[in-house]
Amino acid sequence: MIEVLTTTDSQKLLHQLNALLEQELRCQPKVCGLRLIESAHDNGLRMTARLRDFEVKDLLSLTQFFGFDTETFSLAVNLLDRFLSKMKVQPKHLGCVGLSCFYLAVKSTEEERNVPLATDLIRISQYRFTVSDLMRMEKIVLEKVCWKVKATTAFQFLQLYYSLLQENVPHERKSSLNFERLEAQLKACYCRIIFSKAKPSVLALSIIALEIQAQKYIELTEGVERLQKHSKISGRDLTFWQELVSKCLAEYSSNKCAKPNVQKLKWIVSGRTARQLRHSYYRITHLPTIPETVP
């Protein structure tokens, strides 16, 4: 138990954390299946880590385009990886699988009025398959994930860990740890298949611990240690994933990182499609950079 948390809000957050920790291992990708994808050769016939990562980047682009919540993106990635870790998917079918997972996540987390029509989603994504194809693939995905769409995600842990840490920070220092920056870092990690092998709690705390260490927020170090102990995360695991997160973020900000196809991000839309799309579809059309810290 985290003894210093005595307020009602803190106790509610802690109760939520305990519930997430209890459910964490349910509805996660099969690690053995992810390893098979990582070891596959890129011969155009088998699913590879590179193809998976590019598909996730496309889903992130769609999330930004429609202005959907990060939890929607997180759930879409979870569904995609759960399916890919169970099934042998041919590269030519990946687009339909990815969009089906995305649509399931959208319908599960977003308000009904914000859910796009399947026809619009396919047009915006520039795929050639039909609505019937998408619906058939949705059913296949649902069957393979045992109709369990909801899952515990690293984003949920990131939100809770951040809120719990903020409870123990003096009011004048509450803005020091930038949640938007942490959120962007998590999105970058989602675009690498290796992080789907990490427990959601470990990935979330690794990102926070790394940021606190990098920005020298000494007053938050003890709070991270308490969260680590409460979540039963070993120091070895935390260090291992921190190093991988650090490497990922370094590559993300360098020329080595394979950026999403800029041309595709322009989303060439026909006049007819543009007239049919809802106004809310034009909220965001670019990928965000990881925000700088406030001096």
Swiss-Prot record:
Q: What is its main location?
A: nucleus
What UniProt keywords are attached to this protein's entry? Cell cycle, Cell division, Cyclin, Mitosis, Nucleus
Q: InterPro entries in the record, alphabetically?
A: Cyclin (IPR039361), Cyclin-like_dom (IPR013763), Cyclin-like_sf (IPR036915), Cyclin_N (IPR006671)
Q: Tell me where in or outside the cell this protein is found.
A: Nucleus
| Pfam families tied to this protein | Cyclin_N (PF00134)
The terms describing its cellular component in GO are: cyclin-dependent protein kinase holoenzyme complex; cytoplasm; nucleus
Q: What is this protein called?
A: Cyclin-G1
